[in-house]
């Protein structure tokens, strides 16, 4: 990208090298750690290829929560001269956007299935998959739909900071898309190469599993945060989460009526501060009644996005939670997903807190620490 003007903000050195690497590989992985600016690198690389006429349209596939807050925002920042559209909403609306003249079209994973035929017929010659671990299983409908819209000459860049983080076999589905010759034809053969059976239901990684996975997931570039010396101390990203139907119902009701009835209990909002606090409680998943009882709400959308963040991180995750009962709800849900979790709230003694923080900093577990904001 030596002759490139780098529109928008000035890139960091690792972003320049990442963008250059992507432009040199029709199919490639970007494994830069979370918070290193992978999105900007991919946008600049795409814009460069568009300038050269090597690609005509770009399809960005990413989580629903970052379609607007990350990708559309970053495209306006780093490629403001390009036409951008988000394919979300009804099937007809998505189809119209796919057929539009937008140079960048952003769509979520499951949205691809809705308009897969339209995408396959269109002229998307570069596909960028953000948080690519969602395509680790080659048997899923999601994986098969992505494979369907790819042509032999399609550019494909798959990005994630946590490749094969759960198991070496996770590399198979990713490699089959980018580097199919780097893995066996069948999953079972690959599994035998990277794992060995301990018992009927237990498999463990072989000693050479890391090397096998490394060779399969090529060509690839990776920068860790400590290698990116010019990064700011803190990097902020936003994610959008829709309220669940249950939350939305009572959120609107409380806004309109100022008094909400849930399961026979009255929850009063006698002033603006209390009103706002109740709305925040609904959003967080647990509302306190006037009698002190906690009433739980469906927070599957909120939890899904939190789980995405945890899965995408190669480091431990500290989560600040505004309300005590919401912490318990999150801890129980994380536990069901086998994610080791510790809690810091008002019921935890100072001595116990010290032990929890020490474990979080030095031990493999817990992976997640949930803390009340005012406690921390």
Predicted regions and their residues:
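Conserved P-loop NTPase motor "coupling/switch" region that bridges the ATPase
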Residues: 81-84, 126, 134, 143-228
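Conserved Helicase C-terminal RecA-like lobe
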Residues: 2, 9, 23-24, 35-37, ...
């Amino acid at each position: 990208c030596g002759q490139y003007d780098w529109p928008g903000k000035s890139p960091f050195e690792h972003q320049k090298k990442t963008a250059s690497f992507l432009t040199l590989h029709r199919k490639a992985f970007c494994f830069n750690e979370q918070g290193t600016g992978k999105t900007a690198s991919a946008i600049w690389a795409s814009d460069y290829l568009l300038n050269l006429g090597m690609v005509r349209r770009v399809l960005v596939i990413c989580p629903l929560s970052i379609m607007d807050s990350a990708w559309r925002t970053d495209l306006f920042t780093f490629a403001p001269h390009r036409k951008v559209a988000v394919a979300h909403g009804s099937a007809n609306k998505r189809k119209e956007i796919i057929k539009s003249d937008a140079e960048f079209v952003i769509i979520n994973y499951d949205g691809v299935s809705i308009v897969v035929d339209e995408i396959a017929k269109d002229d998307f010659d570069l596909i960028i998959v953000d948080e690519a671990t969602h395509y680790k299983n080659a048997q899923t409908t999601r994986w098969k739909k992505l494979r369907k819209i790819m042509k032999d000459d399609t550019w494909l860049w798959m990005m994630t900071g946590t490749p094969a983080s759960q198991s070496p076999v996770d590399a198979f589905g990713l490699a089959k898309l980018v580097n199919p010759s780097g893995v066996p034809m069948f999953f079972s053969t690959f599994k035998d190469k990277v794992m060995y059976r301990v018992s009927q239901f237990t498999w463990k990684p072989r000693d050479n599993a890391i090397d096998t996975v490394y060779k399969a997931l090529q060509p690839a570039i990776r920068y860790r945060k400590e290698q990116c010396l010019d990064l700011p101390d803190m990097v902020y990203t936003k994610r959008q989460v829709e309220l669940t139907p249950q939350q939305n119902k009572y959120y609107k009701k409380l806004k309109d009526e100022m008094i909400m009835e849930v399961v026979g209990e009255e929850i009063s909002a006698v002033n603006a501060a209390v009103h706002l606090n109740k709305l925040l409680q609904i959003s967080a998943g647990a509302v306190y009644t006037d009698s002190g009882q906690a009433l739980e709400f469906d927070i599957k959308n909120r939890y899904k996005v939190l789980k995405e963040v945890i899965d995408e991180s190669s480091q431990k995750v500290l989560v600040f939670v505004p309300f005590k009962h919401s912490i318990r709800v999150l801890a129980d849900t994380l536990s069901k997903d086998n994610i080791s979790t510790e809690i810091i709230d008002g019921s935890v003694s100072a001595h116990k807190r010290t032990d929890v923080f020490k474990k979080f900093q030095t031990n493999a577990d817990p992976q997640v620490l949930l803390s009340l904001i005012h406690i921390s």
